[in-house]
């Protein structure tokens, strides 16, 4: 066999082996290794102000490249207010309505489907997850639309959800958001929280049960 042909065979084997080494198989999908590098760090999605408040008041958020599987449906009941930088307009003693949410199609640091019972809320970009063992952090940006008296207000928020996943549900759930941008076509007639306002919630009994 000629050296020229041996070279082409060897080159072909290198290409095939290289391609196999670049693939990682999940439960239902195959993605390229290094895909995690395309997942933005939480600091690029969530404003530093909320991250600092979260760290100071709750503790460091769970991090890691191998988060637990958190697929399922859950209910925050009772939904308690924990902390805000606007306690005059947002008193902590108010108990809010229960909040249900569902998570599905989780793959390699991305959650394809995240749905809340608040129908006006829609993620505006990908939903990301990181963590280790049973500890996880979900983070993303969302757009929430309010319609009142014929006027529309559109709020862009940064969202964080952390907790510990267990068979019975999510323990020690914390759920926070910060307003990043506000569009208001009422010329100030409809007053909403301004950009920079943040709000942190928890499940009052420290367990968000599976549904």
Model regions and ranges:
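C-terminal motif of bacterial Sec signal peptides marking the signal peptidase cleavage site
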Residues: 17-21
């Amino acid at each position: 066999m000629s050296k020229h042909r041996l070279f082409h065979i060897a080159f072909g084997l290198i290409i095939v082996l290289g391609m196999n080494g670049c693939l990682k198989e999940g439960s239902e999908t195959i993605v390229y290794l290094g895909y995690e590098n395309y997942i933005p760090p939480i600091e690029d999605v969530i404003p530093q102000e909320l991250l600092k408040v979260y760290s100071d008041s709750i503790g460091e958020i769970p991090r890691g490249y191998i988060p637990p599987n958190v697929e399922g449906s859950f209910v925050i009941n009772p939904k308690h207010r924990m902390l805000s930088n606007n306690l005059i307009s947002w008193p902590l003693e108010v108990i809010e309505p229960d909040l249900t949410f569902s998570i599905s199609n989780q793959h390699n640091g991305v959650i394809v489907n995240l749905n809340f019972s608040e129908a006006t809320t829609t993620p505006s970009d990908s939903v990301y997850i990181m963590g280790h063992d049973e500890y996880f952090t979900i983070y993303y940006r969302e757009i929430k639309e309010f319609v009142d008296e014929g006027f529309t207000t559109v709020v862009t928020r940064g969202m964080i959800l952390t907790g510990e996943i267990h068979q019975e549900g999510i323990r020690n759930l914390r759920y926070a958001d910060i307003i990043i941008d506000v569009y208001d076509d009422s010329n100030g007639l409809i007053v909403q929280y301004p950009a920079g306002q943040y709000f942190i919630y928890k499940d009052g009994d420290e367990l968000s049960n599976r549904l």
